Amino acid sequence: VKNGPGGTMQLVGPDGLVTRKFSFTTLAEQKCLFDQTRVASATAQLSASGTVSSQTVRDLTPILICAVPKNTTRFLGATLPDDYLEKDLMTEDGVLEIDLSNGKVADRSPSVQEGVDAISIKATEEAIYFINRYNNKLYRLLRS
């Protein structure tokens, strides 16, 4: 993973070539989490007798979870990260889960009526947790 100016992130393969490029703006320290999650994958084996058996293997996969502001125009006149930390700037976020091994992006945004300004992101194999700065409540998003 390489970070670039202007909110760009590049996934780089073992050969040094860029495999996927993302562009989004967020406050990485407050709104992102690098995680490793266990992902199930099935393998099939053929026995000497000709029967096929399958086995589920759970591999560790590197994941980036970020709360991404839906509108960043308010960032233009802000002093970052100070205005954000002092709550002079609030955001309304979507939540993205990016599999860093293949670049697959899953939108995990909560379906709630009130705004979500997500901080303190944590994750388990089953769920993503965060605090909403608008109401100081803990939220849980199930991972499917």
Show which residues each predicted segment covers.
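Residue position within the beta-strands of beta-propeller blades
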Residues: V1-K2, I65-A67, Y129-R133
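Short glycine/acidic-enriched loop and turn motifs that connect beta-strands
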Residues: N3-G6, K70-R74, N135-L138
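Short, conserved, GDST-rich strand-edge loop motifs in beta-rich repeat architectures
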Residues: R58-L60, A67-M90
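Beta-propeller blade signature
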Residues: M9-G16, L85-N102
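Blade-level signature of beta-propeller repeat domains, shared across WD40, Kelch, NHL, RCC1
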Residues: A118-S144
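Acidic, serine/threonine- and glycine-rich low-complexity intrinsically disordered segments
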Residues: V1-C32, Q36-Q45
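Short coil/turn segments that connect the beta-strands within blades of beta-propeller domains
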Residues: V39, L60-P62, E125-A127
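Conserved blade-ending motifs and adjacent loop-strand segments that build the rim/top face
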Residues: V18-Q36, L100-T124
